[in-house]
Amino acid sequence: MDFVANLSPLALAYVGDAVYELLVRAHLVGRGPAKPEQLHREALKYVRATAQARVVPALEEYLTPAEKDILRRGRNARPGHLPRTAAPAEYHSSTALESLLGYLYLQGDWARVEELAHLIFKLAEQD
């Protein structure tokens, strides 16, 4: 059995949240010098559940069937709480995205994580 495939979607999202945060920070720092407070404000534009949820529909067409399955499992996961800053559907979509990133990271597929991150940033910056 595949250990990673058997993890709960919420466990995958827990890891994926950290992976995504790191990717966003590296992306922003890579743009050039900025003050930490500016970087933090800019990072919020990417990491908020509403921002993550906006890119998921467009991202889906680039996913493999296995990745779409992980995304679906993440979307259907039911955490014990929902944040007040996002609608339930947005939060579930952001959990789905984080589940996918966590899954790929734990599978050791960093190249795919970076490929999807590049696409996510491109989609996010179109808004």
From Swiss-Prot:
Its main location: cytoplasm. The keyword rRNA processing applies. Pfam families: Ribonuclease_3 (PF00636). Keywords: Cytoplasm, Endonuclease, Hydrolase, Magnesium, Nuclease, Ribosome biogenesis, RNA-binding, rRNA processing, rRNA-binding. InterPro entries: Mini3_fam (IPR008226), RNase_III_dom (IPR000999), RNase_III_sf (IPR036389). It is found in: Cytoplasm. Homodimer. Involved in correct processing of both the 5' and 3' ends of 23S rRNA precursor. Processes 30S rRNA precursor transcript even in absence of ribonuclease 3 (Rnc); Rnc processes 30S rRNA into smaller rRNA precursors. This is Mini-ribonuclease 3. It comes from Moorella thermoacetica (strain ATCC 39073 / JCM 9320). The gene is mrnC.
